[in-house]
Regions:
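Glycine- and aromatic-enriched membrane insertion/assembly motifs of diderm outer-membrane
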Residues: 46-103
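Residues that define the transmembrane beta-barrel architecture of outer-membrane proteins
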Residues: 31, 50-54, 89-93, 110, ...
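Short loop/turn motifs that connect adjacent beta-strands in outer-membrane beta-barrel proteins
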Residues: 20-31, 65, 103-111, 168-174, ...
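Short glycine/proline- and aromatic-enriched beta-strand/turn motifs that initiate or cap beta-hairpins
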Residues: 19-61, 218-229
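Outer-membrane beta-barrel "beta-signal"
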Residues: 94, 98, 208-231
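Extracellular/periplasm-exposed beta-strand and loop segments of Gram-negative cell-envelope proteins
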Residues: 45, 73, 77-90, 123-134, ...
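Transmembrane beta-strands of outer-membrane beta-barrel proteins
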Residues: 33-37, 68-70, 93-95, 110-116, ...
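Transmembrane beta-strands of outer-membrane beta-barrel pores
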Residues: 39-43, 72-78, 99-101, 118-124, ...
């Protein structure tokens, strides 16, 4: 009888230890929405007097490693060189997702991710002047100063993104991302080209590819917590 009692207590102790280990291997991970701004636009305004812009960014944690993401903003850029002078002003929106490839330890919510954005922009150009060049160096170049407006222009493009977000304080994140952009379509004005697209940046002739960097700060709004197995 004593043997059965001892065996019973040993079994209870083993189950208790196993349950405690299982409990210790589980922690709660925060699910919520992050909202913030792209600081690279503010930095750019300090270094480029002819540029104005602001971008609001956000994401929502849908699954353990999957985040739905959005960006929206406005930009205004004045460009003047030896050939022409023009202004571009418009707004844009980007929608996509990020996938976190980083396995966090307990109480860490950092991200190293790959993602994509499908982007669209609406904008206007104001052509201030342009120069007609002549191969004959004996005559001055013909500069035409005639303001002309090109309205209701548009462009769409795709972005492939590599980046990270680090939780520097509780629910406060700093991030960096590299963007590879591919222009998909655009509505161009008559007798002019889209040399600058808000949200995409400069558009080069016969080249629909662009590159960009973002520096972000975001604040998380916790919605709920979900159990996760400790690594």
């Amino acid at each position: 009888m004593l043997r059965y009692i001892i065996s019973f207590f040993i079994l209870i102790n083993v189950i208790s230890v196993f349950s405690q280990e299982e409990k210790d291997s589980i922690f709660k991970s925060t699910y919520g929405m992050k909202i913030g701004i792209d600081l690279s636009k503010q930095i750019r305004m300090l270094t480029e007097p002819d540029y104005k812009g602001i971008v609001v960014i956000g994401d929502y944690r849908l699954l353990d490693k999957l985040f739905l993401a959005f960006e929206m903003g406005t930009e205004e850029k004045f460009i003047e060189n030896e050939v022409l002078s023009f202004n571009t002003k418009g707004s844009f929106i980007k929608i996509g997702a990020n996938y976190n490839v980083f396995n966090n330890f307990e109480n860490l919510e950092n991200e190293i991710y790959v993602g994509f954005r499908v982007s669209s922009s609406k904008f206007d150009h104001q052509l201030n002047s342009f120069t007609i060049y002549s191969k004959d160096q004996y005559w001055n170049q013909n500069k035409i100063e005639n303001t002309e407006f090109f309205k209701d222009l548009s462009a769409t493009w795709f972005e492939l993104i590599f980046g990270f977000n680090a939780e520097v304080f509780n629910n406060t994140y700093m991030g960096l991302s590299l963007r590879l952009k591919r222009l998909l379509s655009q509505k161009e004005p008559t007798n002019f080209r889209n040399l600058y697209v808000p949200g995409f940046n400069k558009v080069l002739e016969n080249n629909k590819v662009g590159v960009g960097l973002t520096y972000t700060v975001q604040f998380q709004i916790p919605i709920y917590k979900k159990k996760k197995i400790k690594i």
